[in-house]
Amino acid sequence: MLTAEDKKLIQQAWEKAASHQEEFGAEALTRMFTTYPQTKTYFPHFDLSPGSDQVRGHGKKVLGALGNAVKNVDNLSQAMAELSNLHAYNLRVDPVNFKLLSQCIQVVLAVHMGKDYTPEVHAAFDKFLSAVSAVLAEKYR
C-alpha cells in the first residue's frame, strides 16, 4: 500500500524522468535484454541492438504507460486494464518479466537521478513498481 508520502515522492521523481521517456525506456529495455537474455524471446521481430528504433519506440511506450500509472496511482487496475489484457491474453508474457523490467527501470532512474534518488524515493518507487507489476499480472490468476 502506497502512503501519501510515497505518492508524493513518486510524483516528484517522475516529474524529473518524464521528459526522458524514450531514452530511459530504451536504456531499461537494453539493460533487461542484456541482464536477462531470456526476455528477448518476446521480441522476435525487433532489432534488439542498443539504441535501435524499435527498442527506443517500445521504451517510450513502456515509460509512457508508467507515466499513466503515476497519474492514476489511486486506480491502477482500471488505468492498466488494457495493458494487463494485452500482456496476459495476446502476448502471453510470463509475469516474472514485469519484475525484471522493474528492476532495470529502478537502476536507470538511480543512475540518472543520482543523489536525488534517495533511499526513500527508491523504496517508494519499488512499492509502486511492485503494485504496477501486480496489476499487470492480475489477469493471469
From Swiss-Prot:
The keyword Heme applies. Residues 1-141 form the Globin domain. The keyword Iron applies. It comes from the Eukaryota. Heme b binds at H58, H87. One of its GO terms (cellular component) is haptoglobin-hemoglobin complex. It holds the Pfam family Globin. SUPFAM superfamilies: Globin-like (SSF46458). One of its GO terms (biological process) is cellular oxidant detoxification. GO terms for molecular function: heme binding; iron ion binding; oxygen binding; oxygen carrier activity. Keywords: Heme, Iron, Metal-binding, Oxygen transport, Transport. InterPro entries: Globin, Globin-like_sf, Globin/Proto, Hemoglobin_a-typ, Hemoglobin_oxygen_transport, Hemoglobin_pi. Red blood cells. Ref.6 chain was isolated from Hbm, the least abundant of the four early chick hemoglobins. PANTHER family: HEMOGLOBIN FAMILY MEMBER, HEMOGLOBIN SUBUNIT ZETA. Belongs to the globin family. Involved in oxygen transport from the lung to the various peripheral tissues. Heterotetramer of two alpha-D chains and two beta chains. The component D forms dimers of tetramers upon deoxygenation. This is Hemoglobin subunit alpha-D.
